[in-house]
Amino acid sequence: MRTSIYNIETRIGINGTPYIMEVSPRGGGNRLAEMLRFATGVDLIINAVRAAVGDDVDDIRQKPYSGYWAEVILHSDTDGYFKNLVIDDEFYRSHVVQKDLWVKENDRVSVFKGANDAIGTLVLKFESEKQLVEALREQNCWMKINVE
């Protein structure tokens, strides 16, 4: 337990008392360690492996973020068969750093009820917080998930 990445999840009870729900030797969910690598250049995953095998780790420290970052969890609004993901060309060129689609055309998809209904992710980068907030609020203006 000396050197690693740990996921610690807590909850505040209705009585105001904090409770530890989980402590596990893993990075947080939704690609958090990868998002930190994009934003800061610090690779927690490689360094966790290095530490696990007794190798020296690279410089791990709090670094300023380069830009404003978001991860969008892709999901369907309806049950059906996935047709395609359409992203506005200009938006794609300007902001999409990585697209990871987990389904292919005609795969069965379900309306989003939980993490197991996700169909992929987008990693986005912006020049300002205002751009980021607007893009996340107006996703239907630059992205469409087509399902039949």
Please give the residue ranges for each predicted region.
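Active-site "cap" helix and flanking loop/linker of ATP-utilizing ligase/carboxylase catalytic domains
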Residues: M1-N7, S24-D79
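A generic structural signal for alpha->beta connector loops
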Residues: R2, T17, R93-H95
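Short beta-strand micro-motifs enriched in acidic
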Residues: R11-N15
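Solvent-exposed, flexible loop/coil residues
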Residues: G16, L36-T40, V86-D89
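Protein kinase-like catalytic core scaffold
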Residues: Y19-E22
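Peripheral (often C-terminal) accessory segments that flank ATP-dependent C-N-forming ligase machineries
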Residues: V49-E148
